[in-house]
């Protein structure tokens, strides 16, 4: 069992990010979480990689990191670039889920000299034609999106766990992962007896809606000349708001020159939460292939 990580606040140009570091051997692994979550959702996976040197960060607008500025995916990508520079990370194995997968691909393409490989877990890299609807989404305000109406007053993390454990999609998660999510998902509200979500539901909704400019990822994909493992769940009707379906372009693997796809038809978008053992095994295998020491 791994020791608890070191954690520290990393001050960037206009925001402070909370970083967790599990010290270990070999080249670093950097983990980026999905929209609405936080870095400690990786804990069960990290425990299965006992010797690896791992960094996990709360993205801007999430967890204990700052929420300064307007929601913008490019802004969050720049945060990760600055984090890599500030910590002087070299030969990074980037691991990203959903939003984190998009950011990992984008940052690696822009800063390829810092990366050795990627594990992209159901990344939000939409089919090209879906980005054509970005102007339509931009006309919808965050308070119009269903996730903006999430329950946002909680007694404690135990109440949250009990409420979610038998409800989709959480009922398909490993209980330990759900516990980790709930344990770090809430923050105190000054002057109030209840807790609120660390990721404001309005910020979460705005992230889903703000796809403008994200089609740039297709211009960057040719830069990804490095080993990539793509884990993908089944897609759903693009017209439906279903956060359990895969947002990933089904033909993405054909655009990744050194890509290997693991298609998981029996799973939902929440692959790391449903099968942390599989994700840890996938990371360890790619780490062994690309790290000088081959640890995992």
List each model region and its residues.
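Hydrophobic, aromatic-rich cap/lid helix
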Residues: 175-219, 235
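Conserved hydrolase catalytic core segment
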Residues: 90-134
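Catalytic histidine-centered segment of alpha/beta-hydrolase-like enzymes
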Residues: 264-276
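Conserved loop-alpha-helix segment in the C-terminal half of the alpha/beta-hydrolase fold
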Residues: 222-267
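Conserved HGGG/HGGXW glycine-rich cap/lid loop of the alpha/beta-hydrolase fold
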Residues: 18-66
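Alpha/beta-hydrolase fold catalytic core
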Residues: 1-29, 50-53, 89-90, 125, ...
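A catalytic-pocket lid/entrance helix-loop region that shapes and gates access to the active site
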Residues: 121-154
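Active-site loop/oxyanion-hole signature of alpha/beta-hydrolase fold enzymes
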Residues: 55, 59-95, 281
